[in-house]
Amino acid sequence: MKILKNIFAILFLSNIVFARPIIIKLATVAPEGTEYYNLLFEMGQRWQQETAGQVQLRIYPNGVVGGERDTIRKMRVGQIQASAMSSIGLAELTDQIQAFTLPMGFQNYNEIDKVKSVMFDDISKGLSQSGFKLLFLVDIGWVYWFSAEEISVPKDLMDAKIYTTAGDYITVELFKKFGFNAVPVSETDILTSLQTGMINSMQTVPILSLSSGWSALMPNMLDL
């Protein structure tokens, strides 16, 4: 059974004006060398080829410009022109993206594709109202619980230090309401926080856990 679905989107500032040649700075928390980074790299190569070098994509991976909230702020002031962003960042710009993060809301990719096709225009409109242009939405996999200690029932998480995104006060309060210990951490500080024991459990997609080195510190994955 699937818990959550994570969505990856490419955003552009809708009102940005470029001088030629165009250099587009794109920020993402996706680690360099992963499938998703490689897709972005290939996209940039294609743009450069199709425009005879007039459009160039400069990718900043691994969250080097900050977390997704930081990226949104830097896009608004023109430091960054584009972002490959997860549903966490997108939720800062439009509530409609939360449809893809409903617990137990989807059973397979066909259901996801159907909802994406129905909601794409509405999501795009919501982002446009915030000053951003949506290029496309892609899947990055099902979200699972990862933990340093073995978990099988909710009670096993009562003593865990659960990661939540810094600034996501609603999720923190929700965890606390049910007796869990939520620890807000920036996306760029997750690995350090795992190494120091500040957090020891989180919800994420397997490819990100593996490529970021988190799975070495949280070897237990709960498959619902």
Label the model's feature ranges:
Residues 20-110, 127-224:
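N-terminal secretory/targeting leader peptides
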Residues 2-10:
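Sec-dependent signal peptide recognition
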Residues 107-124:
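A gly/proline- and charged-residue-enriched helix-loop-helix capping module
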Residues 9-13, 32:
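Enrichment for repetitive, rod-forming helical segments
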Residues 4, 124-125:
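Short secondary-structure capping/junction motifs at helix and strand boundaries
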Residues 14-19:
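N-terminal signal peptide c-region/cleavage motif recognized by signal peptidases
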